[in-house]
């Protein structure tokens, strides 16, 4: 099984796009990317804009190579919203647009899947709480819809995914933010056997703590990452996305590494997983613009 993180916040864009090769299949998970229109009262730096185009190009290439595409929810950094035609001709496992979904995501999903004609032209399966067993021994399991972070958030719900091939599994928990609620944690802990090769998860949004998200939820997300390290025990725990938007993210990861080491779990950002130095350009936006002034 091969796992490539195509784009992520530690790679310079808002994303957690992932590409998996397993049991003869190529699977694109949440292949999309975006950037914050304003951060620190500043627009995106040209370097961010270039990185976004590069990330979207990689996402398109990986989607074209995929037999299977997965969309865990309909936030714009998780799918190629303006290019539904790229999803035709492959199996698309997507969040149900008719249940356990907020108004915004329902509208986006309807526009993308139904209004575009993709449902009629493509092979679309709503994946909530379902298990797909394919020829060659590939199994793709989906959680029930869980909160996008703290319980009751207006951001709605997302799906988590486990991909298993020949007794080897990976788990993908996009936008659960730690998770920032215990229901999502319990769902993840059900997937402890076989021990995951890698868990790719969005960390808590420290940059929004006490502002748009309660600090109690952020702290719960950090604690739940520690629980996952000790009880789910993935061989590699990739924590990225929302967490990396705060310059304090290395401190959180260092604390997590201290707890995870005893369980034999390696903690990494997406960039580190890919053998690269983290470049969270959104977090660096002030410095990037100051460099222009100099």
Swiss-Prot record:
This is UPF0282 protein APE_0500.1. HAMAP family: UPF0282. Signal peptide: none annotated. It comes from Aeropyrum pernix (strain ATCC 700893 / DSM 11879 / JCM 9820 / NBRC 100138 / K1). InterPro entries: RibonucZ/Hydroxyglut_hydro, UPF0173_UPF0282_UlaG_hydrolase, UPF0282_hydrls. Belongs to the UPF0282 family. It comes from the Archaea.
């Amino acid at each position: 099984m091969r796992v490539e993180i195509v784009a992520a916040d530690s790679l310079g864009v808002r994303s957690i796009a992932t590409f998996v090769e397993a049991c003869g299949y190529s699977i694109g998970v949440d292949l999309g990317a975006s950037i914050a229109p304003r951060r620190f009262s500043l627009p995106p730096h040209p370097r961010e804009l270039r990185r976004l185009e590069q990330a979207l190009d990689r996402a398109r290439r990986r989607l074209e190579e995929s037999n299977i595409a997965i969309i865990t929810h309909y936030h714009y950094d998780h799918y190629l919203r303006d290019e539904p035609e790229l999803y035709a001709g492959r199996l698309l496992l997507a969040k149900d647009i008719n249940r356990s979904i907020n108004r915004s995501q329902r509208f986006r999903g309807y526009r993308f899947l139904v209004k575009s004609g993709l449902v009629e032209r493509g092979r679309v399966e709503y994946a909530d709480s379902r298990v797909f067993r394919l020829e060659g021994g590939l199994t793709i399991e989906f959680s029930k819809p869980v909160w996008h972070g703290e319980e009751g958030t207006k951001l709605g719900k997302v799906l988590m995914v486990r991909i298993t091939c020949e007794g080897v599994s990976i788990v993908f928990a996009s936008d659960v933010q730690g998770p920032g609620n215990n229901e999502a944690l319990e769902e993840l802990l059900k997937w402890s056997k076989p021990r995951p090769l890698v868990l790719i998860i969005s960390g808590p949004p420290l940059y929004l703590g006490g502002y748009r998200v309660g600090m109690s939820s952020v702290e719960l997300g950090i604690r739940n990452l520690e629980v996952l390290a000790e009880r789910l025990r993935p061989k590699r725990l990739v924590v990225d996305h929302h967490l990396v938007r705060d310059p304090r993210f290395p401190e959180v990861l260092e604390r997590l590494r201290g707890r995870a080491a005893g369980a034999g779990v390696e903690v990494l950002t997406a960039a580190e997983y890919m053998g690269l130095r983290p470049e969270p350009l959104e977090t660096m936006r002030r410095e990037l613009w100051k460099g222009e002034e100099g």
